[in-house]
Amino acid sequence: MSMTAGNVVFVGNIPYDVSEQQMTEIFNQVGPVKTFKLVLDPETGSGKGYGFCEFFDSETTAMAVRKLNNSELGPRKIRVEFPSNDPRRNQSYEYTERTDRYMEQQNAHESSYNSRFIPPVLHSTSSLPASQGGGMPSPAIYSSSMATNLNKNINSTSVPAYNFHNSMTSDFDSASQPHTDAYNARTFQYNKSSQNKGDYTSGTSISNPTSIPLAPSVVQVLSTFSAQELLNMLSKLQTVVHIAPEEARRLLIANPALPYAAFQAMLLMNLVDANVLQQVVVAVKNKNMHQPASATSSPPSVPQKIPSSNHKSQQANGSDQGNEGKRMALIQQLLALTPEQINALPPAQRDQILSIRRQHFRQ
């Protein structure tokens, strides 16, 4: 019996005395089950201890993996995973392998921030209908609320530096977020005259994302996040892209802070190879040097290096600031490229840029 790819989960470590009907009842707690198939031994006719459960949609499939994996069934804990032909399986394993070391280094930091900064949308159980058993909100609900909050922040004339974080935690009680005065003290101004360079609320293309200095505020916000919080944010955004790609595209275009923050989070989690990023930016810079200057746009400039001092402490600070400035310049150059600039590049370089931009959002 064939099953629909993307709607199937692998279930392992099943007790041998459990029937398909019992397993169906268990998985019905997550959502309607289309079919459950135990793999049987052809000689004995008994179960081999694993099987496959098919749902009616991929969203319920992902929810089953999150909610039922390692749940107890008799004396055992069942394994609920994406099958080997589902790209989400490899993505999930890649996150685990690449973040273990980072998370170990952030344990002390995480203990002090988890209670304050985890967005309630990550663990809300009231966003889904009762028939689906609650759990993680659907991508449509998550993306719509995020877009609404981000649009409110971008439309204001003076936007707090922590707008991106505040937009994801708008339902928090302000009393649960100490020290917010220090955060809100750093602000950046949104110049309404820059609207002729791109509409930040209507969903049209952004011709000059760097017209608003998002970099400092986004970097400051993400520096307060633990590894688990960064991973949750990226996983949520990936779910939106996987389930509702068109809605995700409109969300990212309408809110330039969101893709920038996601890309910066990928850098912090070491999900982007710095050497590849450097090669792409250098190639783009060399390509732009051989093209006539455009009347409507110009390639972003690289910040000048901070002059060195005779004092060792000043030299150390200058080196750190210089490295941070270089990294921010690389990110800004990559994100500021217009579709025309990307299409003008040779195919190899163009594919490399698009691959870096989409390597997390596209499977």
Curated annotation (Swiss-Prot):
The keyword Signal does not apply. GO terms for cellular component: cytosol; Mei2 nuclear dot complex; mRNA cleavage and polyadenylation specificity factor complex; mRNA cleavage stimulating factor complex; nucleus. Keywords: mRNA processing, Nucleus, RNA-binding. Residues 291-325 are annotated as: Disordered. It holds the Pfam family RRM_1. Residues 7-85 form the RRM domain. GO terms for biological process: co-transcriptional mRNA 3'-end processing, cleavage and polyadenylation pathway. CDD domains: RRM_CSTF2_RNA15_like. Residues 306-322 have a biased composition (Polar residues). One of its GO terms (molecular function) is mRNA binding. InterPro entries: CSTF2_hinge, CSTF_C, CSTF_C_sf, Nucleotide-bd_a/b_plait_sf, RBD_domain_sf, RRM_dom. It is found in: Nucleus. Component of the cleavage factor I (CF I) involved in pre-mRNA 3'-end processing. Interacts with res2. This is Cleavage and termination factor 1. The gene is ctf1.
